[in-house]
């Protein structure tokens, strides 16, 4: 059953989110899967890399591209613990990823107005999307992280 596999892969993405948190980053993790194998992994690394584009999704896509020697990541599924931002959505679409599975949505983060503004409507593209796999767990790590930060 696909839902069980989605949970399996999301648990791995969550491990990368926890790693990001342990390193003082916003806790977001991502993995890219092709034919039941992980071809790319990433965790948010904006602070440590001094790079505003070092989002978990972007890092996973870059690694996958290097691994398969192609930027076209067709027939892959991206698992990410938070609904992708506008920048990451563009990369997902340009990479030709077939399927996106995310855990928490911006709504889960208490309707943060900043986050709400940067989401793009992915449903208008050919990307198949499955939402809210392990939603509570994915939202919890982010909510706890932001409780301890002052913005």
Swiss-Prot record:
Its cofactor is Zn(2+). It holds the Pfam family MafB19-deam. Residues 4-122 form the CMP/dCMP-type deaminase domain. InterPro entries: APOBEC/CMP_deaminase_Zn-bd, CMP_dCMP_dom, Cytidine_deaminase-like, tRNA_aden_deaminase. It catalyses: adenosine(34) in tRNA + H2O + H(+) = inosine(34) in tRNA + NH4(+). Its EC number is 3.5.4.33. PANTHER family: CYTOSINE DEAMINASE FAMILY MEMBER, TRNA-SPECIFIC ADENOSINE DEAMINASE. Homodimer. This is tRNA-specific adenosine deaminase. It comes from Buchnera aphidicola subsp. Schizaphis graminum (strain Sg). The lineage of its organism: Bacteria, Pseudomonadati, Pseudomonadota, Gammaproteobacteria, Enterobacterales. The gene is tadA.
């Amino acid at each position: 059953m696909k839902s069980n596999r989605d949970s399996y892969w999301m648990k791995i993405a969550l491990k990368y989110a926890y790693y990001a948190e342990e390193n003082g980053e916003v806790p977001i993790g991502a993995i890219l899967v092709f034919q039941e194998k992980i071809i790319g992994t990433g965790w948010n690394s904006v602070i440590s890399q001094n790079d505003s584009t070092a989002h978990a999704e972007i890092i996973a896509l870059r690694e996958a591209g290097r691994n398969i020697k192609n930027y076209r990541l067709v027939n892959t599924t991206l698992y990410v613990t938070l609904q992708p931002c506008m920048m990451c959505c563009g990369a997902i679409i340009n990479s030709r990823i077939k399927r996106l599975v995310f855990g928490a949505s911006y709504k889960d983060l208490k309707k943060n107005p900043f986050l709400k503004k940067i989401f793009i409507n992915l449903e208008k593209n050919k990307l198949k999307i499955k939402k809210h796999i392990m939603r509570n767990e994915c939202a919890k790590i982010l909510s706890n992280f932001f409780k301890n930060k002052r913005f």
